[in-house]
Each structure stands twice: as structure tokens, then as C-alpha cells.
Amino acid sequence: MRKRIFYIFIFGLSFLFFSCLSFFVRPPHLIESRGRCSAEDLTVFFMSQNPKADRAKVKRLAQFYIEESETEGINSDIAFSQMCLETGFLRFGGLVSEEMNNFCGLGSLGDGKKGESFPSEKTGVLAHVQHLKAYATAKPLVRPPADPRYKYVNPKGKAPTIYGLAGTWAADPNYGKKLENILTRLYKSVY
């Protein structure tokens, strides 16, 4: 009888443990997928990481990321998280400055090469999303190219997951893990 109660207890405990684990939504790894977060979700997460940022600007950028990513078939959660990684949550520094509207370091190759500048936030976001699409898939762009460096990514589709961006998009071998870390924090804050 004691053995039976023990087994029932262990079964109940394991059921509780595994059912609690299933509530956490795992972050996406495939770049060519659909984002889950709303502009408000992205904004709230971002502000928790950089409370001094301009909330209106962050919300605008979040909405642009959702719209442009949806158009090009790229995961907006991944693109937005990559912007957070590349800009230090809009703290910038290094070769890219805020007024450049360059949210992913496009063209900043070191040796003093500052990188691309874009006329508006929306154009800068579109260029980022299109550049990310070049790494994720060989499918053609939906919108006319805003990314002047799109043509240099060859072969197209060489990094379909966030982990493939390590050593391709960025030299850092831990780049994919850093991006996953931001996505995990985002999803834990939302789900």
C-alpha cells in the first residue's frame, strides 16, 4: 500500500513539474517564421532593459518591425531582438549612431567604416529586415530593396536559424546564443 501511494505521489509530482514546464513558450530559432509578440509586448520588454529610452520611439520601432517583418516573411520577434543586441537597446556606440537609423550595424565593417545611413526609422527597419531575410532564405524580396547590402549576401539563405548568424552576420561565435538569450528574456516577460 505504501509503495502504491509513493508511486501515485511521484506520478502526481512529475505531472505537475512537466505541465508547469509546458507553459513557457520557447523562443523561435527559425528566422523565416512568424513573430508572436505585439508592439506593446516588445515595448514593455525593451523598456525593462533600457528605462531611459524614448518610449514613443521604441513603440514606433516595434510596430515597424512587426509590419516590415510580416511583409517579408521574417519573424518580428527575432528581428526586434537582433536590433536590441546590435544597438545595445538603442544605446548605440561604436561605428553606428542614433541619427543613422541603422538598427543592425549594416555596413559597419570596422576600420572606421561607419556603416549605412537611412532617411527614416521605417526605412532603416525595412533595410534590417531585408538583410536578415537574405540570410534566412533564398526567396526574393517582396518590397523594393531598401538594403544596399542585400546583393552582397551570398548564397541567400545561408543562415536559416539564429545560430547560423554566428560567423556569417557577425564574427562572434556566440552571436546566436546571445540572440537566443534576448529572445528568452523577451518571451519570459510576455508569456
Per-segment meaning from a language model:
Residues 2, 20-191:
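Catalytic cores of secreted/periplasmic lytic hydrolases that degrade extracellular macromolecules
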Residues 2-9:
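Bacterial N-terminal signal peptides that target proteins for export
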Residues 9-19:
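Bacterial N-terminal signal peptides
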